[in-house]
């Protein structure tokens, strides 16, 4: 059934339901990935089989084969020697679940996408954006194995730089989907000063930098060190000789536990301050929806800062660390919504969907209007 003139608000209803599901699955994937890291389960599967690897060991012989593979890597020999098969199964299931969820996301994204393309439900501008998101998702699978491979030969854990890259790419994909969903909403343009647009974009950019810095802290397990606040290593600003002792100097930004955690703290202060200034400006100019968005973002960052402080004080226990990671997703979502809200015009949204307007080949009974 062809819809000759679907209302703007319902034009992409089916596509938006699909993308919302994908975004939710990615959020779950990020949290499962965090739990996999915190339980030190990420190296339990030492091979990459994108298709046949979807099946776990089904017999005792297969379990022993998988366990024997794990016994060959440094993590087992140096950290987990003497681990029992039952203990191995625990860490195996975390990593297997993480990989399985990645496969599920790929299927949930690709099959409906192809169906919508076949039905002519997606205009040319959206096709380009959604194909790029799919390509990033495929790349993410390869990046995940690239990360795991870094811990299979010499290290007892994965490279923190590769871990940060893996997480950052997942968050970029998530943010792109949230941005796309917002553009499809076809809401009226928000009237606000240009400086609010600038600070909203700065907040989004700084949020990504902070998320990358947080991933470095996680990868180095730096949150289990320097467990005081506001002091770090006995001072508000640690001694330069300890912050920059590695050569060349830039290696400290990625490898020095003290520098990495200090940078994460300083970025948090900068992000919170910028969010406060953005909120005050939005409230003073009575920017409507933008003011509400600014308040929500500031409140989320305040909660996130508190979670970060407690995570450090208690040396990064799993529950607090996961809560901190979950709240980071909330902050990113709100930052994306605020930036999109202040940068898009109504004309932008209308033009992007023009290719499908008037020929949205989606059965109305499948996605009825709310």
From Swiss-Prot:
Chief place of localization: membrane
Residue numbers binding heme: 264, 324
Pathway recorded for this protein: Porphyrin-containing compound metabolism; heme A biosynthesis; heme A from heme O: step 1/1
InterPro entries, sorted: COX15/CtaA_fam, HemeA_Synthase_type2
GO biological process entries: heme A biosynthetic process
Stored Pfam families: COX15-CtaA
Cofactor(s) demanded: heme b
Reactions this protein catalyses: Fe(II)-heme o + 2 A + H2O = Fe(II)-heme a + 2 AH2
Record keyword Transmembrane present: yes
Membrane topology: Multi-pass membrane protein
Role this protein plays: Catalyzes the conversion of heme O to heme A by two successive hydroxylations of the methyl group at C8. The first hydroxylation forms heme I, the second hydroxylation results in an unstable dihydroxymethyl group, which spontaneously dehydrates, resulting in the formyl group of heme A.
Subunit (UniProt): Interacts with CtaB.
Record protein name field: Heme A synthase
Organism: Rhodopseudomonas palustris (strain TIE-1)
